[in-house]
Regions:
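Hydrophobic secretory-pathway targeting helix
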Residues: 1-31
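Hydrophobic alpha-helical membrane-insertion segments
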Residues: 11-23, 47-52, 126-149
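Transmembrane alpha-helical segments in integral membrane proteins
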Residues: 11-18, 95-113, 182-205
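Long, glycine/tryptophan/cysteine-rich extracytoplasmic
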Residues: 19-86, 159
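Individual transmembrane alpha-helix segments
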Residues: 62-100, 177-188
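Juxtamembrane interface at the cytosolic side of transmembrane helices
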Residues: 102-146, 197-205
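Juxtamembrane non-transmembrane "cap" segments at the membrane-aqueous interface
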Residues: 141-166
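Solvent-exposed, non-transmembrane helices and loops of integral membrane proteins
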Residues: 162-177
Length: 205
């Protein structure tokens, strides 16, 4: 029972780690997004200005000590600020989960992986690898637009403040749907790399 709990807490750690890496890597690849997505033509601001405002937003979302969101070049509505506050809480929840489950992951590596007991969890790992693939295929079939909408409807039940009006919250113009598509693809690659590696390792004799 204790071993199973350690395993699933470790899987939760890897899941949260995949999310956090995606979030923090956004700081690195966003300058490329500005160029690839021609964001300067959407808001008529210099790339440096767009990036500066993005950094302010990301710092607010990821830093628990940052409590006020005020982007110098983008006004925000009450609904927009509410949505970002909700997202901030979700990000902090993921950070907390990663910290709480980190010790379990350490025990998992030392007590299960290194001692050769990973094969006992092969079926569980396979399920964790296949499930996101099936979800991804579903997303491809219905189109990312529909998938993105469904994702928000599930994550923010009864809250439609994620539906930004560019006239009231122009920051959405520098956060186009394609940017989130790239973030989803990055998360998928990280997630499948972690869990795929463990599954393949569990199958080795």
């Amino acid at each position: 029972m204790k071993t199973k709990l350690t395993f699933w807490c470790s899987m939760l750690f890897l899941f949260s780690l995949s999310i956090l890496l995606t979030i923090y890597l956004a700081w690195i690849f966003y300058p490329f997004e500005i160029q690839w997505l021609n964001l300067t033509n959407r808001v008529y601001l210099k790339p440096e200005t767009i990036q500066y405002n993005f950094h302010i937003l990301m710092n607010y979302l990821t830093n628990p000590f940052s409590q006020i969101l005020q982007m110098p070049d983008f006004r925000s509505s009450a609904a927009g600020l509410h949505h970002f506050a909700v997202v901030k809480n979700l990000f902090h929840l993921v950070q907390l989960v990663a910290l709480v489950t980190l010790p379990s992951f350490y025990v998992f590596v030392k007590g299960i992986v290194k001692k050769g007991f990973l094969s006992l969890f092969s079926k569980g790992l396979l399920a964790l690898v296949v499930l996101p693939v099936l979800i991804g295929l579903g997303g491809v079939l219905i189109g990312f637009d529909q998938f993105f909408t469904l994702f928000h409807q599930i994550l923010f039940v009864g809250d439609d403040t994620w539906l930004f009006d560019p006239a009231k919250d122009p920051v959405i113009l520098i956060l186009p749907e394609t940017f989130f598509l790239h973030a989803f693809l990055l998360f998928f690659a990280l997630y499948e790399s972690f869990f795929g590696y463990l599954y393949l390792k569990s199958r080795r004799k």
